[in-house]
Amino acid sequence: MTWASKYYVVAVFRRMRLIVFCCIAVITAALMSLSKESSSNSPSKVLQGLNDSSVHGMWGFGADTVYFVPYRSKSIRVEIQVSKAVGADVPRKMLLLLPGWNYADTQWCTRTSVCSTALSRGFDVMLVEMGKSVYMDSLYPEMRVDYREHPTRVWLWKEVLQPLQVRGYFTDKGVPEDPVRISNGKVMYKSLRLPIPTFVMGLSTGARGALLLAIEHPEAFRGCAGLSGDYNPLSMKSDNLMINCLGKYEQVPWRWRGSNNIQMRINELKVPCYLAHGEADNVVPFQQSQQLFDAHENARRAAGSSSMRSTMKWVLVKNGMHNYTFWGEQGIRALDFFEE
């Protein structure tokens, strides 16, 4: 090979190596850009933005918002619809609507007029995709494997609701504003930004979630409503839904009487409650609501009205069924109750 030929081969090799290096650099930069973009849109980043009141500097939400919160191996959809009716005569409120077992959360809005009515009355509306949740506090060893993929109420509170306290929801505490430093160096505040009154309503198993959240977090809610709910698993020991969540009664009887039994915890309820059930309900017997109301009234009489602050309104609808027609009608009645 001549000297010229060798020089040509070396030159071609160097040029090819330069092209390869350039391609690698371009690909690496593109991958880093995609990674950065993906990270900025991840659920954790979205939550960080939602929770950072110093960045947003707002009370409530400024516009309709959808975001996702991680739960185990998936992300749970959360939707906030913002009322446009809020003004001097219509104060802002929040309504959390909980779906029943295997019901789409959005059906509160697509199959009833509860959402639109609430929005017209100054309620922001919150929907959470709970899937087949039975609103338990834990994932018990006996729980069916596929049920574990759906959120507990403890997760709902800690990961979804509690983070919104910085925006004024789900809290009874205001935020001091307009600081003024006085002569002795202390800081005084001219005003207080008041919390946004928050209410919770659930249908079917969602009614369980609504009342349990109200019992466990009375500071977060001004009122609760349960439509067609089941509140005492002891009266349904053969119910497959309860067995698949809690385990068989004969094996773990204490669990059926424990923290997931609303009727046995009724003396803990501190907020006003609206109960409604259809007499023709062939899914959950109306006696579940009737017996809960009776237990509440017995507890009130035993404790005295001064020590048990909650009030409960109980409505039995003669031809009411376990369907969206009933939930739509009684959901509006519950809104009336909240505004009394």
Describe each region flagged by the PLM.
Residues 1-12:
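Short, low-complexity, Lys/Arg-enriched N-terminal segments of secretory-pathway carbohydrate enzymes
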Residues 7, 22-23:
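Short helix-onset patch at the extreme N-terminus, typifying the N->h transition
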